[in-house]
From Swiss-Prot:
This is Alpha-aminoadipate--LysW ligase LysX. It comes from Sulfurisphaera tokodaii (strain DSM 16993 / JCM 10545 / NBRC 100140 / 7). It catalyses: [amino-group carrier protein]-C-terminal-L-glutamate + L-2-aminoadipate + ATP = [amino-group carrier protein]-C-terminal-N-(1,4-dicarboxybutan-1-yl)-L-glutamine + ADP + phosphate + H(+). Residues 95-280 form the ATP-grasp domain. Its cofactor is Mg(2+). InterPro entries: ATP-grasp (IPR011761), ATP-grasp_RimK-type (IPR013651), ATP_grasp_subdomain_1 (IPR013815), LysX/ArgX_preATP_grasp (IPR054562), LysX_arch (IPR011870), PreATP-grasp_dom_sf (IPR016185), Rp_bS6_RimK/Lys_biosynth_LsyX (IPR004666). Binds 2 magnesium ions per subunit. Catalyzes the ATP-dependent formation of a covalent bond between the amino group of alpha-aminoadipate (AAA) and the gamma-carboxyl group of the C-terminal glutamate residue in LysW.
């Protein structure tokens, strides 16, 4: 099998993915995005050869979507495809799809003026969480304890360069324990995950200091993860889940280019090898 791995930053995951693929006897062609280009309707494009699959590993959402689109235009199988990446990156798109199919998500308000956002936030009761429509690693996600705090956050958002700065996404503050769950779907399975524990901060992103711990996946969580995968699409997803003491599992977000270094470390589970073997099965079908 010939694999292309496209990346803009060579992190542990990309290095491990290339290493494990080569260990399994596959040919890997690393593609550095900043050196990559494409001319539409032009014969001067450099050929990438007979790639069986391109694995998308760009950290930049824009680069990921556009390069996946190019590879799809060239008829390469791409993990993940551009449609999946768009659904994952846009939180309102994700929430809309999941709620439409009966998946429990945080109570969410979307408003198009600051005044309406402030008015509707009272229906959720404080504290509330404000987050950008697009973004990752917990950046620009804030908790407002009252209306005055929320107003300040909304005004700050308006003066940023965010693409959706005049769209206000406000959610309930889910009273989860000092942790959340990241569970991975690979192909048609949900084989591994972690708890992300942070007793010092309400944000549970490992990028913000949360500690990874092994996750024992129960049947309900596994079924839920696979339902989300079927709705969103994609071959390799990282799904973030809250545990509400009364309502049970709540899907928070879905990541289309998930990091997994900490998952490998605490579970002693080779995510890269598992992913490659599932790709092998997929290609043979």
């Amino acid at each position: 099998m010939i694999l292309g791995v496209i990346y803009d930053l060579l992190r542990w995951e990309e290095k491990n993915l290339i290493q494990e693929a080569r260990k399994l006897g596959h040919t890997v062609i690393p593609i550095y995005t900043k050196d990559f280009y494409y001319f539409y309707n032009n014969d001067s494009n450099e050929t990438l050869g007979d790639l069986d699959v391109v694995i998308q590993r760009n950290t930049s959402h824009a680069r990921a979507v556009i390069t996946s689109t190019i590879f799809e235009n060239l008829s390469y199988k791409t993990i993940n495809d551009s449609s999946t990446l768009i659904k994952c990156e846009n939180k309102l798109y994700t929430l809309s799809l999941l709620s439409k199919h009966g998946i429990r998500v945080p109570k969410t308000i979307v408003a198009f003026s600051k005044e309406k956002a402030l008015e509707l936030a009272n229906k959720l009761s404080y504290p509330v969480v404000i987050k950008p429509v697009e973004g990752s690693w917990g950046r620009m996600v804030a908790r407002a304890i009252d209306e005055d705090t929320l107003r300040n956050f909304l005004e700050y958002q308006e003066y940023t360069t965010l693409q959706f700065r005049y769209i206000y996404l406000i959610q309930e503050f889910v009273k989860k324990p000092d942790r959340d769950i990241r569970i991975f779907t690979i192909g048609d399975e949900a084989p591994v995950g972690i708890y992300r524990v942070n007793s010092r901060n309400w944000k549970t992103n490992t990028a913000l200091g949360a500690k990874a711990e092994p996750l024992k996946i129960d049947e309900e969580l596994q079924d839920l993860a696979l339902k989300v995968k079927d709705i969103i699409g994609g071959f390799f997803l990282g799904i973030d889940v809250f545990e509400d003491p009364e309502r049970g599992y709540i899907i928070n977000e879905v990541n289309g280019v998930p990091e997994y270094k900490n998952t490998v470390r605490v579970n002693n589970f080779n995510v890269s090898e598992y992913l490659i073997r599932k790709i092998e099965e997929w290609i043979k079908k």
